[in-house]
């Protein structure tokens, strides 16, 4: 009798997404394109910034950051108006340690997939990593250093704003506008497939790197159904590879 009561309670609390599902899908697709703008524009601007004056570089950085903040406002407001999850859970020490565990798991998956990619294809980086690395390599060319305002903007996009927007969209909005509250497997798999497809995967191994990353991020989100957890894991993951390059740039810039 107790089991039946619990089952009925779960069914009654299994909330449906708000709005029309077809419209929600179209909005989701549009937002995929929208969230590419901040990091895309900043990476395009980076190599050209060596030719810009200091004032132009600062103005461009402010413009890119302003556009990014506007997009965050739009995407966040849409998410908050459609979510069926509690958005005000605190981040305790236990949660931080668990998220670091998810980060380590994601890094292990990435290393194993990269090793397989090297063995079977001879490539040691994915197309997405290569594109970002080529941009970041500019930061260590001491004769043609980009202005610090543009560099700080790129780092901000890669480490903070990019992960923030991607988690809002690929975990939060995708799950909570297209699936019922307690659905797991379908949003887990499909969101990870879509996430991987957005990272320029060119072979099965590079696809696996981002698919498994998407899986780990979804598990981080699903643990408490709190988007802040997957955001933290994603931001830490991007920062691990980006911040050392930024520190090297700062050392060259202020020498």
Feature roles, as predicted:
Residues 16-18, 87-92, 139-149, 180-182:
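Helix-boundary and loop/linker segments of multi-pass membrane transporters
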Residues 40-41, 192, 196-197, 204-255:
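Functionally important transmembrane alpha-helices
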Residues 70-76, 154-180:
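Transmembrane alpha-helical segments in integral membrane proteins
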Residues 25-29, 58-59, 96-104, 152, ...:
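Hydrophobic alpha-helical transmembrane segments
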Residues 1-119, 242-255:
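N-terminal, membrane-interfacial amphipathic/helix-forming hydrophobic leader that caps
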Residues 165-190, 219-229:
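Membrane-interface helix/loop boundary segments of multi-pass membrane proteins
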Residues 63-68, 157, 209-217:
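Hydrophobic core segments of transmembrane alpha-helices in multi-pass, intramembrane catalytic enzymes
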Residues 121-147:
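Membrane-interface interhelical connector segments
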